């Protein structure tokens, strides 16, 4: 279970970072 939680956390971080980069790029920051 600990590996499952770690995997979900890593996935969430990568997903959030990807969305942030797309939004920032669209805003021309």
UniProtKB/Swiss-Prot annotation:
InterPro entries for the chain: Cytochr_b6-f_cplx_su8_sf, Cytochrome_b6-f_cplx_su8
Membrane topology: Single-pass membrane protein
Gene Ontology biological-process entries: cytochrome complex assembly; photosynthesis
Keyword Transport applies: yes
Leader peptide range in chain numbering: none
UniProt keywords, alphabetically: Electron transport, Membrane, Photosynthesis, Thylakoid, Transmembrane, Transmembrane helix, Transport
Cellular localization per UniProt: Cellular thylakoid membrane
GO MF annotations in UniProt: electron transporter, transferring electrons within cytochrome b6/f complex of photosystem II activity
Superkingdom of origin: Bacteria
Keyword Cytoplasm: no
Bilayer-spanning residue ranges: 3-23
GO cellular component: cytochrome b6f complex; plasma membrane-derived thylakoid membrane
Record NCBIfam families: PRK14747.1
HAMAP family the UniProt entry points to: Cytb6_f_PetN (MF_00395)
Purpose of the protein: Component of the cytochrome b6-f complex, which mediates electron transfer between photosystem II (PSII) and photosystem I (PSI), cyclic electron flow around PSI, and state transitions.
Family: Belongs to the PetN family.
Record text on subunit structure and interactions: The 4 large subunits of the cytochrome b6-f complex are cytochrome b6, subunit IV (17 kDa polypeptide, PetD), cytochrome f and the Rieske protein, while the 4 small subunits are PetG, PetL, PetM and PetN. The complex functions as a dimer.
Protein name: Cytochrome b6-f complex subunit 8
Gene: petN
């Amino acid at each position: 279970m600990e590996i499952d939680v770690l995997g979900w956390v890593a996935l969430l971080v990568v997903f959030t970072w990807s969305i942030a980069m797309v939004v920032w790029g669209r805003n021309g920051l």
